[in-house]
Amino acid sequence: MDFWKFFPFLALSTIWVLCLASSLQAAPFRSALESSLDLGTLGDQEKHLLLAALMQDYEQMKARKLEQEEQETKGSRVTAQKRSCNTATCVTHRLADLLSRSGGVLKDNFVPTDVGSEAFGRRRRRDLQA
């Protein structure tokens, strides 16, 4: 008796497999990557719609990537910041650098400031050898 309950299922599945096999022989399955899109057959409006869809997908992908990067940076407590020095020595060095890099009429007459390690006002280290 179990055979007669199973027989209709077996018959229907066999018919389905045969239909599927015959349809694959008639038109072979091609993946989306294998099929090439011929832009010559598309009209102007279809080309514009395709371009708009591609741009929208690209923008969404970039937005998701930016959101993901923002979430990653929010999660980390350590932020990479350049340390700045605001002491008089650092400011003097920056100003001297700016003046030396800036060109202009006064460049020929410009005398560089003495901002080295032996500049006026700096403590001189005593030699330990003496």
From Swiss-Prot:
Family of this protein: Belongs to the calcitonin family.
Gene: Calcb
Annotated PANTHER family: CALCITONIN GENE-RELATED PEPTIDE 2 (PTHR10505:SF3), CALCITONIN-RELATED (PTHR10505)
Record-linked Pfam families: Calc_CGRP_IAPP (PF00214)
Subcellular locations according to the entry: Secreted
Tissues expressing the protein: Detected in nerve cells of cerebrum, hippocampus and pons/midbrain in newborns, and only in nerve cells of pons/midbrain in adult.
Presence of keyword Chaperone: no
Role of this protein: CALCB/CGRP2 is a peptide hormone that induces vasodilation mediated by the CALCRL-RAMP1 receptor complex. Dilates a variety of vessels including the coronary, cerebral and systemic vasculature. Its abundance in the CNS also points toward a neurotransmitter or neuromodulator role.
Positions annotated as propeptide: 27-82, 127-130
GO molecular function, one term: hormone activity
Disulfide cysteine pairs (residue numbers): C85-C90
Name listed for the protein in its UniProt record: Calcitonin gene-related peptide 2
Modified residues (Phenylalanine amide): F120
Signal peptide: 1-26
Keywords: Amidation, Cleavage on pair of basic residues, Disulfide bond, Hormone, Secreted, Signal
One GO CC term, this protein: extracellular region
